[in-house]
Amino acid sequence: MMTEKSNGVKSSPANNHNHHPPPSIKANGKDDHRAGSRPQSVAADDDTSPELQRLAEMDTPRRGRGGFQRIVRLVGVIRDWANKNFREEEPRPDSFLERFRGPELQTVTTHQGDDKGGKDGEGKGTKKKFELFVLDPAGDWYYRWLFVIAMPVLYNWCLLVARACFSDLQRNYFVVWLVLDYFSDTVYIADLIIRLRTGFLEQGLLVKDPKKLRDNYIHTLQFKLDVASIIPTDLIYFAVGIHSPEVRFNRLLHFARMFEFFDRTETRTSYPNIFRISNLVLYILVIIHWNACIYYVISKSIGFGVDTWVYPNITDPEYGYLAREYIYCLYWSTLTLTTIGETPPPVKDEEYLFVIFDFLIGVLIFATIVGNVGSMISNMNATRAEFQAKIDAVKHYMQFRKVSKDMEAKVIKWFDYLWTNKKTVDEREVLKNLPAKLRAEIAINVHLSTLKKVRIFQDCEAGLLVELVLKLRPQVFSPGDYICRKGDIGKEMYIIKEGKLAVVADDGVTQYALLSAGSCFGEISILNIKGSKMGNRRTANIRSLGYSDLFCLSKDDLMEAVTEYPDAKKVLEERGREILMKEGLLDENEVAASMEVDVQEKLEQLETNMDTLYTRFARLLAEYTGAQQKLKQRITVLETKMKQNHEDDYLSDGINTPEPTAAE
């Protein structure tokens, strides 16, 4: 069986009765199976038909002994087949992105202090273990934790205040509140620990040093608020009783985590305007809820039913149960803060002060709603308004120039197609605020699959690839539009992203070929390859059947890009010649003639360069000879002066020497 697989010969089920069991599958353990079946498993990854063949062999009834062996073999085959099918394939790295991005940047962390000696080895190991528990504030796990901590914060901000104001709510469900309270306390404490293990960026690098993380958090105001929010004020229950949830108001100080969750959600969501509106509505509902609770407390302190402004007497069955109490107060708070309804007028001074305060808050809420909602709606409709302005301008121009109705309808349909398919975004305008590196990376991610289909660009340099993807321009053609006509000078190449194009005859009806998404044409004509039988003219009529999205690369942009990459230009031209040669569109005689002309031009250029070098060399030699002669003359003059000075010194010494006296 193994020999047949390696030779590519598949045995028939009829012949399988004479085969022995594969030696790689044994009943005595996993090691023998792994050791003996390594080549077989590699071969089995290519095709599942041998496995199915072996399964069919297992089903074939046999006579005699060996039933247990057959069961073991069947189990082994099924296990191998399942492992092979459920094995995750590693994604093949894309060479285009690898050439552009280069090697991935490894995670760099900053540490405090220098470790020395063998004693430090254990410290490093411990530090590595601690680093495993450092959360990246930009990661998904940190965001999930923000969602977890936002829930108890919102619970305390809503229900803790309501329980403190509505005593029936606290007394009827106090067991549930105890469980939720201490669960939220546990989450608060866990959040304090996680904040101590949350990294931060320092010069763009994620800091994971425990001491730095601790110091960075402890010296902030948020740390003081977090500690204050977990102070065990519940101990006051022993003095005032368990039905006094107001002693837990310090839990409201943990509000920053909820706001942080909202901010991160706004940056992550694909619908930021809708989230902002929802967030604003939530804030308004919380304010109305708090105001309703405060109204109930004020009514309780003044006395229920004392006057028309306070809450009615709870002895009345209609107003004496919890649901009616809260709904009535919420209704009163909504009418007061929104100033859209009539409420009973206040009677006492404290009632007047509270209503005045509520009216001021209501005005601020109304202004906030109008401002924020108006701004959000304007932002949501900004793209449509801009697009509609373009359509109106085109309509006005066509009416002014008295364009035919058919052409006007065609233009309107083209605009409708752009809006329906969300193709109104100007890529240059959207990406202009990004640095060049990020723009290039976005462009290569967006246009990568398209650019890879162009034959001449498959092996180009990474730098040239970046230049090219930045120069690709999207174009949309309407049904019946000619992308190019036979005999036109080719100044652009096109890559089909969506739609279908037809290669048609001169009559525009007869179709020779159909081009679909992924096809490209015109890439050879923009290279100006010598010897091409096509030259730089189009050889066919190409027409759009429906609305077609194409990417265009102009000849000028390509030449501008390859100016800085002469080697890449040679590679592109050589690859273009190979393609033309395979398709029989290269005139070898003309190529040879052009090569001879090129050689002759190179020889002439070389002779000119040699003459120039000879002239420069002769000039340098003359300058050298003249400089050497001048140097010799200066040396001769200096020697003469030195000799003259030496003689003068000798004579002066002889004159100044006194004659010896007779006594001496």
From Swiss-Prot:
UniProt GO MF annotations: calcium channel activity; calmodulin binding; cAMP binding; cGMP binding; identical protein binding; intracellularly cAMP-activated cation channel activity; intracellularly cGMP-activated cation channel activity; monoatomic ion channel activity
Region Disordered, annotated ranges: 1-51
Transmembrane portions of the chain: 147-168, 179-199, 225-243, 249-267, 275-298, 322-356, 357-381
Region (Selectivity filter): 339-342
Compartments in which it is found: Cell projection, Cilium membrane
Polar residues biased stretches: 1-10
Primary localisation category: membrane
Residues forming coiled coils: 599-653
Binding sites annotated in the UniProt record for 3',5'-cyclic GMP: G522, S525, R538, T539
Record topological domains on the Extracellular side: 169-178, 244-248, 299-321
InterPro entries for this protein: CLZ_dom (IPR032406), CNG_cation_channel (IPR050866), cNMP-bd_CS (IPR018488), cNMP-bd_dom (IPR000595), cNMP-bd_dom_sf (IPR018490), Ion_trans_dom (IPR005821), K_chnl_volt-dep_EAG/ELK/ERG (IPR003938), RmlC-like_jellyroll (IPR014710)
Region (Cyclic nucleotide-binding domain): 462-582
Name of this chain's protein: Cyclic nucleotide-gated channel alpha-2
Organism: Rattus norvegicus
Name of the gene encoding the protein in the UniProt record: Cnga2
